[in-house]
Amino acid sequence: VYVSSAHIPEALRPVVLEKWPYTVPAVAQLLRNGLVLRRSLTFLVGDNGSGKSTIVEAIAEGFGLDSQGGRAAALRGRPDPVKTELGKVLRLRTTSAGAAMLSGPRLKKRGFFLRAETAFSMTEQLGGVPGYWAADTSRMSHGEGFTEVFGTMMRNPGFYVLDEPESALSFTTCLQLVALMHQIAQRGAQVVCATHSPILAATPGADIIELGEHGMRRTTWHDLQLVVHWRRYLTDPDIYLRHLLATGDDRHDDVTQ
């Protein structure tokens, strides 16, 4: 691996903890205990607002990756963007391989950050830019564009941070990304991924960390609440839908309303 852990040094700890993002249980736990990255593949899995995107974005920033998505900010001809609140104080412990990569030329850094909020525009803006992909993704569907980006940017060992990459992917293309992540991890890459996808989280050999009101905890794929709920829903959708959808004959009798 390139990064062995993430932590907030004592000297950088915020004085006021009653404000975002430190009110998020997972971030509060990161502040107290840090986060150890034990394997080549790490998935942070949790609901909206659980802090997974906040944490992976700060990890990307800590490795010198563009917080808007991509490689290094200098490749776009602009200065480094202002870091996020967590990114300002988060520090990474790197292995010798990670330290060597960080100390090398920016153009030689083998790393990439896919940020969910900017991913669609990024795929179009960076096509043809040296160091990125040559294909014109504006002529592709979002899913095809994402697949092109992953296949180009994640072909060699490096440090890859992904924020909800499944957002534009079908079931089939999610499986393709699983295969790609598994392959590059076996070749020496490290991937840290925030996801809602039970498909991606099932990638063999991954370390799965579940985020929620409890903070962060390691778990297995079968025990993820995400997986439990998807199984129940696919077995019998009515278990969930009957609590969400209004029922009653008055909704169906008068077709003129």
What are these regions, as identified by a protein language model?
Residues 110, 156-159, 185-192:
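Loop/turn-to-beta-strand initiation segments
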Residues 1-32:
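N-terminal pre-Walker A segment at the start of P-loop NTPase domains
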Residues 40-74:
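Phosphate-binding glycine-rich loops of NTP-binding sites
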Residues 29-39, 153-155, 183:
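Phosphate-binding P-loop
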